[in-house]
A protein has these predicted regions:
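Conserved alpha-helix/loop element of class I SAM-dependent methyltransferases that forms part
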Residues: 18-36
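Class I SAM-dependent methyltransferase SAM/SAH-binding core
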Residues: 41, 49-97
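A short acidic, Gly/Pro-enriched loop at the edge of an enzyme's catalytic core
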Residues: 100-109
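A short SAM/SAH-binding and catalytic strip from SAM-dependent methyltransferases
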Residues: 108-120
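A short glycine-rich, Lys/Arg-flanked "PGG" loop and its adjoining helix->strand segment in the class I
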Residues: 122-137
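Short, glycine-/aromatic-enriched active-site segment of Class I SAM-dependent methyltransferases
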Residues: 140-161
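Short alpha-helix
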Residues: 163-178
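Conserved Class I S-adenosyl-L-methionine
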Residues: 185-251
Protein backbone atom coordinates (compact mmCIF):
# COMPACT_ATOMS: atom_id res chain seq x y z
CA UNK A 1 0.00 0.00 0.00
CA UNK A 2 1.29 3.44 -0.89
CA UNK A 3 2.53 5.00 2.35
CA UNK A 4 1.13 8.44 1.53
CA UNK A 5 -2.28 7.01 0.69
CA UNK A 6 -2.20 5.19 4.05
CA UNK A 7 -1.22 8.39 5.83
CA UNK A 8 -3.92 10.39 4.02
CA UNK A 9 -6.71 7.97 4.89
CA UNK A 10 -5.76 7.89 8.57
CA UNK A 11 -5.51 11.68 8.84
CA UNK A 12 -8.68 12.61 6.97
CA UNK A 13 -10.69 14.97 9.09
CA UNK A 14 -7.77 15.85 11.36
CA UNK A 15 -6.75 19.50 11.36
CA UNK A 16 -3.22 18.68 12.51
CA UNK A 17 -1.06 15.69 11.69
CA UNK A 18 0.34 15.40 15.20
CA UNK A 19 -0.94 15.08 18.79
CA UNK A 20 -1.62 18.77 19.42
CA UNK A 21 -4.97 20.49 19.68
CA UNK A 22 -6.15 23.63 17.91
CA UNK A 23 -6.10 25.79 21.05
CA UNK A 24 -2.43 25.00 21.58
CA UNK A 25 -1.65 25.72 17.94
CA UNK A 26 -3.35 29.11 18.21
CA UNK A 27 -1.45 29.85 21.42
CA UNK A 28 1.81 28.93 19.72
CA UNK A 29 1.13 31.08 16.67
CA UNK A 30 0.32 34.10 18.83
CA UNK A 31 3.44 33.60 20.92
CA UNK A 32 5.58 33.98 17.80
CA UNK A 33 4.61 37.70 17.59
CA UNK A 34 5.82 38.00 14.01
CA UNK A 35 6.03 41.11 11.87
CA UNK A 36 4.31 41.49 8.53
CA UNK A 37 6.47 40.03 5.78
CA UNK A 38 8.29 37.61 8.10
CA UNK A 39 9.77 34.75 6.06
CA UNK A 40 8.74 31.33 7.34
CA UNK A 41 9.57 27.79 6.24
CA UNK A 42 7.69 24.65 7.27
CA UNK A 43 9.33 21.33 6.38
CA UNK A 44 6.88 18.39 6.36
CA UNK A 45 4.12 20.98 6.63
CA UNK A 46 1.21 18.54 6.87
CA UNK A 47 -1.99 20.15 5.62
CA UNK A 48 -0.51 23.64 5.83
CA UNK A 49 -2.50 24.79 8.85
CA UNK A 50 0.38 26.51 10.61
CA UNK A 51 1.54 28.57 7.63
CA UNK A 52 -2.01 29.53 6.65
CA UNK A 53 -2.79 30.55 10.21
CA UNK A 54 0.39 32.64 10.42
CA UNK A 55 -0.58 34.32 7.15
CA UNK A 56 -3.99 35.14 8.62
CA UNK A 57 -2.49 36.52 11.83
CA UNK A 58 0.58 38.34 10.57
CA UNK A 59 0.69 38.48 6.78
CA UNK A 60 3.84 36.36 6.58
CA UNK A 61 5.48 35.10 3.43
CA UNK A 62 6.31 31.44 3.49
CA UNK A 63 7.21 28.10 1.96
CA UNK A 64 5.69 24.76 2.92
CA UNK A 65 7.38 21.53 1.83
CA UNK A 66 5.86 18.05 1.95
CA UNK A 67 6.65 14.83 0.15
CA UNK A 68 3.01 13.67 0.15
CA UNK A 69 0.91 14.66 -2.88
CA UNK A 70 -2.20 14.28 -0.74
CA UNK A 71 -0.93 16.81 1.81
CA UNK A 72 0.10 19.29 -0.86
CA UNK A 73 -3.37 19.06 -2.42
CA UNK A 74 -4.89 19.85 1.00
CA UNK A 75 -2.45 22.74 1.48
CA UNK A 76 -3.34 24.35 -1.83
CA UNK A 77 -7.07 24.00 -1.21
CA UNK A 78 -6.70 25.54 2.25
CA UNK A 79 -4.69 28.47 0.90
CA UNK A 80 -7.27 29.17 -1.81
CA UNK A 81 -10.10 29.06 0.71
CA UNK A 82 -8.57 31.16 3.49
CA UNK A 83 -5.64 33.28 2.28
CA UNK A 84 -5.83 33.35 -1.53
CA UNK A 85 -3.67 36.47 -1.79
CA UNK A 86 -1.00 35.34 0.67
CA UNK A 87 2.58 34.97 -0.53
CA UNK A 88 2.83 31.31 0.44
CA UNK A 89 4.13 28.51 -1.78
CA UNK A 90 3.61 24.81 -1.19
CA UNK A 91 6.12 22.45 -2.78
CA UNK A 92 5.86 18.68 -3.21
CA UNK A 93 9.32 17.28 -2.53
CA UNK A 94 11.54 15.57 0.02
CA UNK A 95 12.12 18.17 2.73
CA UNK A 96 15.74 17.05 3.18
CA UNK A 97 16.46 18.12 -0.41
CA UNK A 98 14.93 21.57 -0.15
CA UNK A 99 17.46 24.38 -0.58
CA UNK A 100 16.48 28.05 -0.28
CA UNK A 101 17.81 30.55 -2.80
CA UNK A 102 19.84 32.20 -0.06
CA UNK A 103 21.44 30.59 3.00
CA UNK A 104 20.42 32.04 6.37
CA UNK A 105 17.30 33.61 4.97
CA UNK A 106 14.28 32.56 7.07
CA UNK A 107 13.04 34.33 10.18
CA UNK A 108 11.15 31.22 11.32
CA UNK A 109 11.84 27.61 10.37
CA UNK A 110 9.73 24.64 11.43
CA UNK A 111 9.73 20.87 11.24
CA UNK A 112 6.99 19.70 13.56
CA UNK A 113 6.75 15.97 14.10
CA UNK A 114 8.96 14.86 11.21
CA UNK A 115 12.56 14.90 12.41
CA UNK A 116 13.02 11.62 10.49
CA UNK A 117 13.37 13.87 7.42
CA UNK A 118 16.79 14.91 8.73
CA UNK A 119 17.74 11.72 10.56
CA UNK A 120 16.53 12.69 14.02
CA UNK A 121 16.13 15.59 16.45
CA UNK A 122 19.72 16.82 16.34
CA UNK A 123 19.90 16.53 12.56
CA UNK A 124 16.67 18.47 12.23
CA UNK A 125 17.92 21.31 14.42
CA UNK A 126 21.21 21.47 12.52
CA UNK A 127 19.50 21.56 9.14
CA UNK A 128 17.04 24.25 10.17
CA UNK A 129 19.73 26.33 11.86
CA UNK A 130 21.67 26.53 8.60
CA UNK A 131 18.79 28.30 6.86
CA UNK A 132 17.59 30.43 9.77
CA UNK A 133 18.91 33.97 10.16
CA UNK A 134 20.74 34.88 13.39
CA UNK A 135 18.19 35.69 16.11
CA UNK A 136 15.54 33.80 14.12
CA UNK A 137 13.20 31.16 15.57
CA UNK A 138 13.26 27.39 15.10
CA UNK A 139 10.25 25.24 16.00
CA UNK A 140 10.39 21.45 16.08
CA UNK A 141 7.98 18.77 17.30
CA UNK A 142 9.55 15.69 18.81
CA UNK A 143 8.56 12.58 20.79
CA UNK A 144 10.20 11.82 24.12
CA UNK A 145 10.21 8.89 26.51
CA UNK A 146 7.99 9.13 29.56
CA UNK A 147 9.49 5.86 30.80
CA UNK A 148 11.81 3.19 29.46
CA UNK A 149 10.12 1.47 26.51
CA UNK A 150 9.65 -2.29 26.60
CA UNK A 151 11.40 -4.45 24.05
CA UNK A 152 7.99 -5.60 22.80
CA UNK A 153 6.95 -2.02 22.12
CA UNK A 154 10.20 -1.18 20.32
CA UNK A 155 9.91 -4.30 18.17
CA UNK A 156 6.26 -3.66 17.32
CA UNK A 157 6.97 -0.05 16.31
CA UNK A 158 10.22 -0.86 14.54
CA UNK A 159 12.21 1.74 16.48
CA UNK A 160 15.25 1.85 18.75
CA UNK A 161 15.31 3.37 22.22
CA UNK A 162 18.22 5.59 21.14
CA UNK A 163 16.08 7.33 18.51
CA UNK A 164 14.41 9.45 21.21
CA UNK A 165 15.47 10.99 24.50
CA UNK A 166 13.62 12.47 27.44
CA UNK A 167 11.89 15.84 27.43
CA UNK A 168 14.97 17.29 29.10
CA UNK A 169 17.22 15.64 26.51
CA UNK A 170 15.31 17.31 23.69
CA UNK A 171 15.98 20.72 25.22
CA UNK A 172 19.65 19.92 25.90
CA UNK A 173 20.28 18.80 22.33
CA UNK A 174 19.24 22.22 21.09
CA UNK A 175 21.45 23.94 23.66
CA UNK A 176 24.39 21.76 22.59
CA UNK A 177 23.81 23.04 19.06
CA UNK A 178 24.13 26.63 20.27
CA UNK A 179 20.40 27.36 20.36
CA UNK A 180 18.42 28.96 23.17
CA UNK A 181 15.26 27.13 24.22
CA UNK A 182 12.49 29.69 24.71
CA UNK A 183 9.37 27.58 25.21
CA UNK A 184 7.95 24.07 25.19
CA UNK A 185 4.39 23.00 24.44
CA UNK A 186 3.69 19.48 25.72
CA UNK A 187 0.82 17.26 24.58
CA UNK A 188 -1.35 15.50 27.16
CA UNK A 189 -3.33 12.26 27.11
CA UNK A 190 -6.38 13.96 25.63
CA UNK A 191 -4.30 15.32 22.73
CA UNK A 192 -2.82 11.88 22.13
CA UNK A 193 -6.14 10.05 22.40
CA UNK A 194 -7.81 12.38 19.91
CA UNK A 195 -4.94 12.03 17.46
CA UNK A 196 -4.62 8.26 17.72
CA UNK A 197 -8.23 7.16 18.07
CA UNK A 198 -9.61 9.51 15.42
CA UNK A 199 -7.45 7.59 12.97
CA UNK A 200 -9.25 4.36 13.90
CA UNK A 201 -12.55 6.05 13.04
CA UNK A 202 -11.18 7.45 9.78
CA UNK A 203 -10.05 3.98 8.69
CA UNK A 204 -13.43 2.49 9.60
CA UNK A 205 -15.19 5.17 7.54
CA UNK A 206 -12.92 4.60 4.57
CA UNK A 207 -13.29 0.82 4.50
CA UNK A 208 -17.08 1.03 4.75
CA UNK A 209 -17.32 3.57 1.93
CA UNK A 210 -14.65 1.93 -0.26
CA UNK A 211 -15.41 -1.80 0.18
CA UNK A 212 -13.70 -2.80 -3.07
CA UNK A 213 -10.34 -1.15 -2.38
CA UNK A 214 -7.71 -3.94 -2.53
CA UNK A 215 -5.66 -2.12 0.11
CA UNK A 216 -8.33 -2.51 2.78
CA UNK A 217 -6.95 -5.69 4.34
CA UNK A 218 -3.50 -4.16 4.78
CA UNK A 219 -5.04 -0.92 6.02
CA UNK A 220 -7.10 -2.73 8.64
CA UNK A 221 -4.20 -4.92 9.80
CA UNK A 222 -1.84 -1.97 10.23
CA UNK A 223 -4.53 -0.12 12.14
CA UNK A 224 -5.16 -3.14 14.38
CA UNK A 225 -1.46 -3.42 15.23
CA UNK A 226 -1.16 0.31 15.84
CA UNK A 227 -4.23 0.35 18.08
CA UNK A 228 -2.92 -2.49 20.24
CA UNK A 229 0.52 -0.90 20.45
CA UNK A 230 -0.88 2.46 21.54
CA UNK A 231 -3.27 1.07 24.14
CA UNK A 232 -0.86 -1.50 25.54
CA UNK A 233 2.33 0.57 25.60
CA UNK A 234 2.47 3.83 23.69
CA UNK A 235 -0.07 5.87 25.65
CA UNK A 236 1.97 5.61 28.85
CA UNK A 237 5.43 5.40 27.27
CA UNK A 238 5.74 8.24 24.76
CA UNK A 239 5.23 11.96 25.16
CA UNK A 240 5.38 14.67 22.52
CA UNK A 241 6.21 18.35 22.56
CA UNK A 242 6.93 21.34 20.39
CA UNK A 243 10.19 23.09 21.22
CA UNK A 244 10.86 26.72 20.31
CA UNK A 245 14.50 27.75 20.01
CA UNK A 246 16.16 31.01 19.12
CA UNK A 247 19.27 30.91 16.98
CA UNK A 248 21.95 32.99 18.65
CA UNK A 249 24.40 35.17 16.75
CA UNK A 250 27.12 32.58 17.36
CA UNK A 251 25.18 29.47 16.31
Amino acid sequence: MDIWKFYDIRHRGLLLCNPMNEEKLERLCRLFRLERGTRALDIACGKGECLVRLAELYGITGVGVNISPYCIKDCLEKKRARVPEADIRFIEMDGAKYEPEHGESFDLTMCVGASWVFGGHRGSLRALSKITRPEGLIAVGEPFWLLDPSEEYLKTEGIRKEEFGTHSDNVKVGEEEGLVCLYTLVSNHDDWDHYETYQWWAVDDYVRTHPDDPDNLELLEKTRVGKESYLRWGRDTVGWAIYIFRKSQKA
